[in-house]
Amino acid sequence: SSGKTTLTLHAVANAPRLGGSVAFIDAEHALDPEYAKKLGVDIDSLILSQPDNGEQALEIVDMLVRSGALDLIVIDSVAALVPRAEIEGEMGDSHVGLQARLMSQALRKITSALNQSKTTAIFINQLREKIGVMFGSPETTT
């Protein structure tokens, strides 16, 4: 609720005006097309993907970057990039570090592709409060 998505939607709205092509990876499945239109986003020219899991989202990002066809890719949000194993697993199963490993591996691959392209990628993340923190900042990313 601090305006991260709104800020990126302004970038998404401006890129086509400058001749750029844009993709929005809506991992949260929460993009409001009407709100985006009010901010100036051309929904008809926007490449929109609502992937089923983290692996699918990151594979789409990698493919789009390697295509060289886009100027901007927004991924909303890192916290919603849930690994396939966690989605398909049983309630209560331990998936310690699974998302961190997925992100680490994918970012190495995507960063390499980004370095060889003209594409900008914006990954949105969320701050959460750590429960029971006595010292230091209680905020953490997920």
UniProtKB/Swiss-Prot annotation:
Keyword ATP-binding recorded: yes
Name the gene behind this protein: recA
InterPro entries for the chain: DNA_recomb/repair_RecA, P-loop_NTPase, RecA-like_N, RecA_ATP-bd
Its protein name is Protein RecA
Return any one Pfam family short name. RecA
**Keyword Cytoplasm included in the entry's annotation:** yes
GO molecular function term, any single one: single-stranded DNA binding
Q: Show the GO cellular component annotation of the record.
A: cytosol
Which family is this protein grouped under? Belongs to the RecA family.
Name its cellular compartments: Cytoplasm
Q: Which SUPFAM superfamilies match?
A: P-loop containing nucleoside triphosphate hydrolases
